[in-house]
Amino acid sequence: MNNKSKIIIYQLFPRLFTNTQPNSVFNGTIAQNGAGKMNQIDTRVLNSLRDMGVTHVWYTGIVQHASKTDYSAYGIHKSNPHVVKGNAGSPYAITDYYDVDPDIAVDVNQRMKEFEQLVQRTHACGMKVVLDFVPNHVARQYRSLAKPKGVEDLGQTDDKGMFFSPNNNFYYITGKSFSPSVDMGEGDDKYVEYPAKATGNDCFHECPGGNDWFETVKLNYGVDPWNGSKHFSPIPSTWTKMCDILLFWAAKGVDAFRCDMVHMVPVEFWHWAIAKVKEQYPDVVFIAELYDVGIYHSYIHYGGFDYLYDKVNLYDKLCAIVKNEESAASLTQCWQTVEGMQAHMLNFLENHDELRLASPQQFGDAELAFPAVIVSATMSTSPFMLYQGQELGEDGKGATGYSGDDGRTSIFDYTTMPLVEKWYSHGKCSIHKINNKARRIRAFYTKILKMCATEQAISQGAFFDLMYVNYQNLNPQKQYVYLRHFDHETLLVGVNFHADDAELEIDIPAHAFQCLGIHSGVCFMKELLSGKQKTAEFSPTAKFQMRLPAHGGVVWKIVH
């Protein structure tokens, strides 16, 4: 991994991204609503992402998962529909860790080859591949038919008469049948599981509810859930099996793994497995989905993760500021919370789990998030991630099936994304069919991402918070200012969460010049988002005049 480049991750779900089926119906089947394919993610699509500033593509929904679509004609085990959420199913209810999902293949029999070709195309276009690794749980009917010769399947040798054994891959509710509160069918259609296995969200009884992850089974990493005791010597078989899965995909050319719900798996496993993978593939990057600031340090410095989701710190704070629930000045607390770890944070404002920025449930307008995007992308050297269609203002409106109208693009249903569909335009990848607002949003994201790629002060530079000397010069409820500096270049970033423009005169303290090694004097300056230029004094005694647009920001580049 090149530590001098700013990582920009684009999350792309092939089943949704290139699906252009017109007139989708509610809760439709794949025959009715269609599905995007890996082969449709061609060089034109990939070049458009690269040209926008993307360095890594996170392909979601690649690994085979539970679905109500019947592929038994291709030798794929058919899922019982009562343990599948939505017609398309959750991409996080894995049915075979060693196989590719048939929905996204043009030729189902060649699905692995189509994935390998996608990896090759992505690399040829100068980007890296990120793949999901789901370590905590599998689909209730997990069964690997594609596993390499000699590989023992999960649960194959489990002693099902024991609730917990360090030699088992699952937890068993002995003497009990699986009896969730949701309908499991009747007669030949009924889903039967005996003994019941523990459910994925740490539900260690036979009766999970509808809001539980009832379609999944919890994996056993050698922790007895009743007393918390750890049984890690000898190495549990689940550890070995899951590490082998990581090595399998790394051998396919996967450059990074986005690891699902890592805090539900013991940090000792990550310490062991990440080291094992990096012995053979030292450049493979590990990204953690993690929601507890208190264990950030452990999962970085002991677990071995390169990057962690900073959801409960920066993401939550930015969303609260846009909604006028917190002050812009409270962003100071965010970098202080992760001080010393900030380079390991993965910043974002959208992914498949979170509300669409433009959704009525979030901000109702993607442009209201512009100042938050500027902060998330430029505050540190850490990676920035965006979700498919975020750059167009997809709003996730309307119910398409299982998910309902929840402000998200459904991952459970066969559906499309209206703005992405217009932009994709059957492979043309053109702005001509999208509306002016979507064009403005895309242009904004392109400027931000390209700036992240080209400005060393963002990708490598130091950070200096200017708020402590400027509370009298701005509205701390709505405005935030900071410096990024590298070598002979300084960026002065100002953002405005207010509905009105703001004219500011900002103080740059002498301590900032000393701390960052900035030379004062008359300098050439350029505002990178608007292109405006000026020559002015940049020193501790000179006020820096800036005009902040409503719901926007500026990035002034000062060349010394």
What is each of the regions a protein language model found here?
Residues H56-G61, V129-F133, R258-C259, L386-G389:
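Short beta-strand segments at enzyme active-site cores
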Residues N3-I9, F13, A93, D103-Q120, ...:
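Alpha-amylase-like alpha-glycosidases and glucanotransferases acting on alpha-linked glucans and related
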Residues M1-K128, N136-K147, L154-K160, S165, ...:
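N-terminal structural segment of carbohydrate-active enzymes
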Residues A256, V522-T541:
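Solvent-exposed beta-strand/loop surfaces of large extracellular or lumenal domains
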Residues A536-H560:
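C-terminal beta-strand-rich structural cap/linker in extracellular carbohydrate-active enzymes
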Residues T20, T29, S67, H82-V83, ...:
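Loop/helix patches that line or flank the sugar-binding groove of alpha-linked glycan CAZymes
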Residues R15-T18, V63-H65, P135-H137, A250, ...:
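Short, solvent-exposed loop/turn segments at secondary-structure junctions
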Residues T20-N39, Q361-D365, K534-Q545:
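Short, polar loop/linker segments at the starts of domains and inter-domain junctions
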